[in-house]
Each structure stands twice: as structure tokens, then as C-alpha cells.
Amino acid sequence: MRVAVLGVGMMGQDHARRLATLTKGAQLVAVSDVDAARTDAVAAELGVRAVHDPAAAIADPEVDAVVIATPGFTHEGLVLEAIAAGKPTLCEKPLTTSPETARAVVEAERALGRPLVQVGFMRRFDAEYEQLRALVASRELGRPLFLHCVHRNATTPPNFNSEMLILDSVVHEVDIARFLLGEEITAITVLTPGRTAHAPEGLQDPQFVLMETASGTLVDVEIFVNTTFGYEVRTELVAERGSAMTGLGVGLVQHSAAGWGGRIAADFKQRFGAAYDTEFQRWVDAVRSGAGVDGPGVWDGYAAAAVCAAGVQSLRTGRRVEVDLGARS
């Protein structure tokens, strides 16, 4: 399967190298970026073609599938072009930057009549989250009552603003809550505690997010992106007959078999590197088998966009905001 990677910033370069050296059944044939010099450098490093127009890469008959790792505001146009061209696509999150444009992508794929677009919510491919989902589905611990989530980064890049804590960071918890619980989020509230002294001027960090699901399970998220000490992602399930936690560095821990420990990861690539590898291999396998998608699809991208848009509204107003996804196509 011949693949082009569109966007070769940090994530795109990582994906291009993965496809070139690790993913079985895939052949990286081209890279594209608005930065021509960077495109040429990555293409030379990996021995592939440099294409300076992403639309040309999508239309290229020598390209079977595309990975979109460009800035989020470009995703809608590129994904719609890929759908029109019938090219299987792995699109980094977000699917698009608004619920309205994400819904348009859902409708475009529906009109095509087959799944073509997978969204890059890589946590679904993490072994610990897969174990936790299986535990929830088994009902061994009874009905889920709470999900307690922690999402911490050491620092933020320049120009990172308060809304981006929701749109770029909490979006992962939105998707993983839907994945683990198997239901939609119906309301969200964003609270703002005191600011850390390490946050840049004007950035509200940390934030506390409370989400409600259709069945009444509560999902809370501590999002703290300027901790200075490392990268931590943890999720604790509290159910009727027990609890279980991921993210302690030793696999899934149940309190009935206590004992845990481990090092704090330096960044998300260290914590979720294996999940990215699995994500790409399963995507390539799905495309080659004709399934098209093996993971989160366009509806998942739309649902995440809708919940995050409601979260931004709550951040601005300080109020609880309901989420209405409408009918699923």
C-alpha cells in the first residue's frame, strides 16, 4: 500500500518514519508540507518524493492512501478531497475544527457508502486502555459510576491558549471516555481553579472538566499542562464492585491486587509510542483487507468536536453546556 504523509512537522515526521521503517504492508512514497525546505529535507532523509501541493499528493495515482498531519484548520478540505478521490485516510485529530465541518465530513463519507477515514485517537490502541475497556464490557466490577482522568504535560508551546486545553488536550479524554464506556457524552462543565505560577500570562492552567454520559456516568478530568516535571495520563474506573486504573507504568492495576510503581514519561511519544505503532499497523491492515477503518471513524471525530465546542462554551461562560449530536447517519 503506497502512502503519502501530508504535513511533516513533529507528528508528521514521526508518522513518516514509522511508515518507512516499521509498518508492515505499507510503502511510504511521498511527503508534503507547506514548508518546502522541510518537505525536501524529510523526503531526502527517507528516500521518497517531495510533493509541495498536498492536493496533488491526494490526486496522484501512485498514492493509494494518505496520512493527514497538517494543522487542524486544513483538515476539512484535505479530508473531503481524499473522500472525493476515494483514498483511504488516517487523519490526525481533530477531524476538523468545528462540529459543523466535522458533520459535513460524516455526510460526505455516508454518501460514499463505505468507511474511508480513520481519526488518530491513538489511546484506543494502548494496551492498558484496551484492557480497561474489556473490563468495563465484562461487567466484572458492575456498572461504571465514575471515570477519574488526569492529563498533565510538562510545558506548553508558544501561543497555546486557554481554549486549547480543551480542543488539543481534553479532546483525548473525550474520545477515550466514549471508547471505554460505549456511550455518548451529553453535557460538559469546565471549572477554573487558581492558575499555576508556571503558566504563561493569560493562560488558564489548570482546568477541571466534568462530563456527563447518557447513562449518568460522571467523567472528570484534571487538565494541567505546565507541571514542569513530565507527562502523566491516568484513568481510574470506579464501578459498583471495585475500581481499576491505567497509567501507573505497570499496566492495569486493580485494587484487589495492589502494588504499583514506575517512572514518569518525558512526553506523549514515550508514553504512547507503542500505541502509535499499533494504530498504524491496524490501519494499514484494514485498508489492505478492504475494511478501510479499524479504529475511530468520522462519527467519533464529529462527537469529539461537538463535546469540545461545548467545553469551550462552558469555559467562556462558567456554565454547564448540554451536547446534542443529532441523529447518527
UniProtKB/Swiss-Prot annotation:
**Protein's recorded name:** Inositol 2-dehydrogenase
Enzymatic reactions: myo-inositol + NAD(+) = scyllo-inosose + NADH + H(+)
Q: Which family does it belong to?
A: Belongs to the Gfo/Idh/MocA family.
Write down the EC number: 1.1.1.18
Q: How does it assemble?
A: Homotetramer.
For the keyword Oxidoreductase, the answer is yes
Q: Does the keyword NAD apply?
A: yes
Question: Briefly, what is this protein's role?
Answer: Involved in the oxidation of myo-inositol (MI) to 2-keto-myo-inositol (2KMI or 2-inosose).
Q: Which UniProt keywords apply?
A: NAD, Oxidoreductase
Q: Could you say which enzyme class this protein belongs to?
A: oxidoreductase
> Pfam families under this entry?
GFO_IDH_MocA, GFO_IDH_MocA_C3
| Any one GO biological process | inositol catabolic process
Single GO MF descriptor? inositol 2-dehydrogenase (NAD+) activity
